[in-house]
């Protein structure tokens, strides 16, 4: 037992030396966690877009249609920049970026409302920036609800024996849960922070592994800086090295970045710490499993580009997981960041407890076990292959 612990300690210390002596690996574990969160947060720093300019094409020209336009202008989401003579004029203004949306009120708008029939209006939005589209749709939905309530109130008050004081429509109030600012950054950055940590250390592990292979090619299949121990001690020592290296970046990502940019932190800090333990272990063993497939240092950057977009999609940030088919859900389940993103959203943004996120928490521990077994098997296989000097004709 003492011998195994000594071997683990030797591998652990040696892996530190390999990481700190590799400029590429240091860039990945320092620059990526330090710079990327700030870059992404600054992109979404404004959080909420207000007063999006729109033009109104009013072919009805009645008090009700004018009231509808005034109600739109009164919302915080949009402002009526001007009235257009017709749709052609409105499209020209959108093309010239004088406005980012068009609201079209047909000539029968007020008549249909007065008859109690379904009234029709049309909206055209610029989709180049999703925040503008969201604001325009939100403003129109809000005004439609308010105007519909006023119409219903007017009908009730015209009854033969109306209730005293009139009848008010059902009041509604929008109460944001978790994401109080309703900002895009507060919605997606907490999940992206977890993905950044994973990518940084996957690339660090791959970079160190590729450097080791290059040393073997230069020395007839022998890595002169490798500690000769068993596969178990090698695996545990390497994993402990990368897990301990993750601690400071994780504190920075999950504590200081949200403070700097006022992202929501409604969860218990101890629940976040408990969540980080299986996540760091899963990322370490996941990286030690994948390191075999990166054989050259030059291949690390393509891996960064390809896997970052792929893992981002599978995590549910850009597309909800329930809308994916079974195959992609299964693939996403194999990625540690997928479960961590879901859990950190619930804990930090919504104030959930770790017990309420037990599915993601248990899934991370399952991945720890799975990737430990797989990485151990891969390491044993690779060690067996290296018993004979590796000769690369290339």
PLM region spans:
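Extracytoplasmic/periplasmic domains immediately adjacent to an N-terminal transmembrane anchor
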Residues: 1-186, 381-394
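Alpha-helical membrane-protein architecture signal
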Residues: 5, 9-13, 186, 227-240, ...
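Residues that define the loop-to-transmembrane-helix transition and helix capping
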Residues: 23-24, 232, 298
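Alpha-helical transmembrane segments of multi-pass inner-membrane proteins
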Residues: 24, 28, 32, 186, ...
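Membrane-spanning alpha-helical segments of multipass transporters and channels
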Residues: 39, 61, 92, 244, ...
